[in-house]
Amino acid sequence: MARCYSGAMARMKPLPTVWIVSDARNDASIERALARLPRGSGMIVRHYHLAKADRRQRFDRLKRLAWARGHLVALAGDARMARRWGADAAYGSPATLAGGPAVPRLVAIHSLREMRRAARADAVLLSPAFPTRSHPGKAILGPLRFRLIAARSQVPVIALGGMDGHAAKRLKWPRWAAIDAFLR
């Protein structure tokens, strides 16, 4: 598996198994959620609902809190922005992360076709594994299809969509990310 990592990923801390994804709906309690994450987890800062200056300020605060607990921090956006803002990694679609400087890339995918487009990915977030509040009514992958797609990946796969510790066990998958799981 080590040969699959880019040079940027090799310089990064070990890839966390548990991730929290920021969102407008968990923003008010994200600090509390960060404290509940196991040490050395990951955080993907999206905060699309904020203006750029406010988003930067929020990112800097969350990054400090996350780093104090040994968490890795990925910024949703292109690789240039992630590098400028001092993120550990960039998070986005295959198209958003196709170019730019060498930073670790976490690419959001929903199908085998999108996985093929994620050529510069260091890891992929495959969703939706299960029903999710983010995309109500959207078709899900389910455990079987999720594992079939994940088995074709050349890079680590992180499950997203309706995930929490119980869903990860049901999916039989070690790496997972969630928006709501740590708010309970």
Q: Predicted segments — roles?
A:
Residues 18-22, 72-77, 87-94, 104-110, ...:
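Short, hydrophobic beta-strand segments that form beta-sheet elements in well-ordered domains
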Residues 20, 43, 82, 118, ...:
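Conserved, mostly hydrophobic/aromatic
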Residues 20, 90-101, 123-140, 160-184:
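Glycine-rich phosphate-binding active-site loops on the catalytic face of alpha/beta enzymes
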Residues 32-39, 64-68, 119-120:
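Acidic (Asp/Glu)-rich catalytic clusters
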Residues 23-37, 78-80, 111-117, 164-167:
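Short, acidic/polar
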Residues 11, 42-103:
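N-terminal active-site wall of soluble small-molecule enzyme domains
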Residues 85, 101-151:
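Glycine/Thr-rich beta-alpha phosphate-binding loop at enzyme active sites
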Residues 1-32:
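N-terminal amphipathic alpha-helix/helix-capping segment at the start of soluble metabolic enzymes
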